[in-house]
Amino acid sequence: MICSYTELKNLIYNSGIGSNIDVGICEEISEAVAKLELYGLNASAEIYRCFKKLSYKKDNIKIIDKSIQFGKGMVIFEGISGLDYFRTNLYDEIIFEELDSPLILIGLGLINNVENFKVLNSTSLIGYVDKKKFFWNENFTGNNVKISIKKEKFKVQQFNSVKSKIKIDKNVWKNLELLSRKILVPESNLSRDFGAGANINDND
């Protein structure tokens, strides 16, 4: 199905809220996913998979010289943290022992206007962001893999280009809608007595 950038961004945002993710994270993730979809990359299915496999745990972070090492991480938590560390320009390398979505990490780099943002799997370049442009190796399909971020200049032969339409798989859209509906308050005696329209304050 075809949708607009705003429609998709709102759906991802509401799906995140429905998954009990903080508002600030939902804002960043929804923008990153919608931006990647503008370029024809299947980020919506990717974020749905991430939402369904949420696990809340303490960050396992090691700082060694100018390197930060995360353990097994999720892009919506450790990925955002890693990007924040990268933007300080204090560290030469950010390493994830395992990251669930390198693609969405690239999207986060893109919307945050980072420069010389080089993402590698082992020694292979899989993505690069610089000056509001990005390259993504579409032959790379790995998830839950070791990832490192380095601030290094790289000469890209061709950056990804914007597509004319955003096309989303109908099943992915439906699954995201189901998550987004979790933000609706179920009808109950409590909600009728104390919710909007209960005449508790002057605005009801």
Briefly describe each language-model feature range.
Residues 15, 19, 112-115:
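Residues at alpha-helix termini
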Residues 44-133:
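A glycine-rich, acidic short-motif signal
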Residues 137-204:
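Extended, charged low-complexity segments
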